[in-house]
Amino acid sequence: MGKNIVVLGAQWGDEGKGKIVDLLTERAKYVVRYQGGHNAGHTLISKGKKTVLHLIPSGILRNNTINIIGNGVVLEPHALIKEIKELEMQGVPVRNRLLLSAACPLILPYHVALDNEREKARGSKAIGTTGRGIGPAYEDKVARRALRLGDLFNQITFESQLKEVIEYHNFQLVHYYKAEPVHYQRVVESIWGIADILKNMVIDVTQVLSQAREKAENLLFEGAQGTFLDIDHGTYPYVTSSNTTAGSVATGAGFGPLYIDYILGIVKAYSTRVGAGPFPTELNDETGNFLRDKGHEYGATTGRSRRTGWLDAVSLRQAIQMNSLSGLCMTKLDVLDGLKTVKICVRYKRTDGTETMSTPITSAEWAEVEPIYEALPGWKESTFGIKEKSQLPQTALNYIKRVEELTGVPVDIISTGPDREETIILRHPFDEMIKK
């Protein structure tokens, strides 16, 4: 019987999802992206060879895996073609392994222009977007004026709709932001060659996944970003423009929620965040710099340095509840090697002196909380590359056990290095049929 699992980030993104998805795809027939866009950056390392993906699912390097980009993903066609060609130069037959939903909203030049002009206008209050047009593209989708991938294949209708939408957005660009307009003809000329390349990959994703499930194939749904960047449940407004929680598998891939067997939350052994927004356990000190440097905490998409801090069990518990996580995968355990003391945030303290074990909702409430830490002994021994739980230092095992106690969820996978082989699998998601 086939199993259907979801892999998603339980923090603010950059948890190491790409490596874990790449590892688990050995057992998956289909790997599906269901939200986000090319603002994601998933890094895969196998036998020392590094591959960075932004749009294409992380199963693309596997010979027998079919990779799908679902309708919940906003698609920048030029970025997709670039990624396809880069992989093909490495000998990966992408066009034989990749399928696309006809319902994917397109990211077009006016979305990028709006994204950048808005960030400029915000000044010191900038959200810290990647500037790739993700938010404006989702806005058009909700406003029912988006051009979708399937629209590309009817030239007359597409050009008519495109002209109308460009006029709409140019009014804002020119008259509000005092910026240059986007030229209709240039957009048209740049898009038509791409339509021919992508046409044979376009499918009805819901039907393909339904047939795969009926054939008892293993399906893996790959999330982008992280739980606390969710447009509804994240640290709003410092969030992305899509739903990053497990529920978006249903809306972003057309796959019924009752068919999901296991949901794996990826969590670093510490915390990181890119860009502005609340981060209660942030460390602006020597320890923070240690975590950043040793963990190579620089974005795969933007190259920006990440903010670093201790593991936050308060937000992690919230992520477990929102996503109904079956188990956790703890990544970058090896980064904590050598620290005399490691800390976990177990509660928040408000400015009025009261304590809470819940995450705030508003920005004002987030600004008022401070972390209450529990300190545990660190370990001097190296955990890098360890593949057996029995080889881990006892203090590292105690740290993992304490995380399990604080969250009520087992740590099923431990990552001790960037390569897919540098992993301890205690319970394989495809071996379990757990529903919560």
UniProtKB/Swiss-Prot annotation:
Its main location: cytoplasm. Mg(2+) binds at D14, G41. Keywords: Cytoplasm, GTP-binding, Ligase, Magnesium, Metal-binding, Nucleotide-binding, Purine biosynthesis. SMART domains: Adenylsucc_synt. It holds the Pfam family Adenylsucc_synt. PROSITE patterns: ADENYLOSUCCIN_SYN_1 (PS01266), ADENYLOSUCCIN_SYN_2 (PS00513). GO terms for biological process: 'de novo' AMP biosynthetic process; IMP metabolic process. InterPro entries: Adenylosuccin_syn_GTP-bd, Adenylosuccin_syn_Lys_AS, Adenylosuccinate_synth_dom1, Adenylosuccinate_synth_dom2, Adenylosuccinate_synth_dom3, Adenylosuccinate_synthetase, P-loop_NTPase. Its EC number is 6.3.4.4. It catalyses: IMP + L-aspartate + GTP = N(6)-(1,2-dicarboxyethyl)-AMP + GDP + phosphate + 2 H(+). This is Adenylosuccinate synthetase. It comes from Hamiltonella defensa subsp. Acyrthosiphon pisum (strain 5AT). The gene is purA.
